[in-house]
UniProtKB/Swiss-Prot annotation:
Signal peptide: none annotated. The lineage of its organism: Eukaryota, Metazoa, Chordata, Craniata, Vertebrata. The modification Phosphothreonine is found at residue 334. This is Caveolae-associated protein 4. Residues 227-255 have a biased composition (Basic and acidic residues). Pfam families: PTRF_SDPR. The gene is Cavin4.
Length: 362
């Protein structure tokens, strides 16, 4: 009995130990599960955060694309505005060039006049027949010349002065004190304006302005149309010209082929369908009318079959070969008239022929 009691106690102790071990293992497993769940939660959080970042980036990209589209629209508008401004500038330059041409013509005329005046002045200077005109402001012109004698001097001294100082002969050169008139002022101002215009439209200034204008125009052209695009446009124009020439040549060939393919009047033989024996048949044929009988074996249609044998179909060839088939027993019936129609047949190799189609009238 004591032995059994000790054995039962030992079994209980062993069970307690096993239960403690299993509890420890369960705790460890629970801890591992919790740690794994924490890691999974952190991973899920990181994934969600990355998704949010990606969405934000997508939004930023959409906004950037919208801004780029807006910039492109603005650029197109500015491009159209620049094109309009350039057209206006070209019109203004044309007007300015026309005005410059007019001014040049006027300046040339004025130069001719100036050269004439200079030549006249040189001739007058050579002849030495001219009058000196002195301009003085606010000084009245003396009407007469008066000589005042000094009473203090004796008569002998006066005679000596007259001997040593002879009077000046003013017959050749006469002096006039003339006020400047309005016409003279206008002439002076006109000459000054002409001098300014000559300086402004001199060769050096015109060359400089042309160079600057050419530089600006070339810059605007390169901005509007690139040289590569110009080359492409030139090549496309050449291609269009070549295609137009080809079309013109093909049209000429087509006309020539049509004119060569038209048959002559001698190629067809028109006659009555059949000569009736009875007067009744003649009356019926008169009522029915005249037709066209084209015999395949005749010499008139021989050249058509030789030159245009490809243009007929098999059925048409059979129709041309078929003659008037007599019925068994009795008189041969009057054949029905045939309709002759001509159709031009166009081929790819630019050879045209007439298609002869024979249809029996119903």
């Amino acid at each position: 009995m004591e032995h059994n009691g000790s054995a039962s106690n030992a079994g209980k102790i062993h069970q307690n130990r096993l239960s403690s071990v299993t509890e420890d293992e369960d705790q460890d497993a629970a801890l591992t599960i919790v740690t794994v769940l924490d890691r999974v939660a952190t991973v899920v959080d990181s994934v969600q955060a990355s998704q949010k970042r990606i969405e934000e980036r997508h939004r930023e990209m959409g906004n950037a694309i919208k801004s780029v589209q807006i910039d492109l629209l603005k650029l197109s508008q500015s491009h159209s505005n620049t094109g309009y401004v350039v057209n206006k500038l070209f019109e203004k330059t044309r007007k300015v060039s026309a005005h410059i041409k007019d001014v040049k013509a006027r300046v040339e005329k004025q130069q001719v006049r100036v050269t004439k005046v200079e030549t006249k002045q040189e001739e007058i200077m050579k002849k030495n027949k001219f009058r000196v005109v002195i301009f003085q402001e606010d000084v009245p012109c003396p009407a007469s010349l008066s000589v005042v004698k000094d009473r203090s001097l004796p008569e002998n001294e006066e005679e000596a002065e007259e001997v040593f100082d002879p009077p000046i002969d003013l017959s050749s050169d006469e002096e006039y004190y003339v006020e400047e008139s309005r016409s003279a002022r206008l002439r002076k101002s006109g000459k000054e304006h002409i001098d300014h215009i000559k300086k402004a439209f001199s060769k050096e200034n015109m060359q400089k302005t042309r160079q600057n204008f050419d530089k600006k125009v070339s810059g605007i052209r390169t901005r509007i149309v690139t040289p590569e695009r110009r080359e492409r446009l030139r090549q496309s124009g050449e291609r269009l010209r070549q295609s137009g020439e080809r079309l013109r040549q093909s049209g000429e060939r087509f006309k020539k082929s049509i004119s060569n393919a038209t048959p002559s009047k001698e190629a067809f033989k028109i006659r009555s369908l059949r000569k009736p024996k009875d007067p009744k048949a003649e009356g019926q044929e008169v009522d029915r009318g005249m037709g066209v009988d084209i015999i395949s074996g005749s010499l008139a249609l021989g050249p058509i079959h030789e030159f245009h044998s490809d243009g007929f179909s098999e059925t048409e060839k059979e129709v041309t070969k078929v003659g008037y088939i007599p019925q068994e027993g009795g008189d041969p019936p009057t054949p029905e008239p045939l309709k002759v129609t001509f159709k031009p047949q166009v081929r790819v190799e630019d050879d045209e022929s007439l298609l002869l189609e024979l249809k029996q009238s119903s």
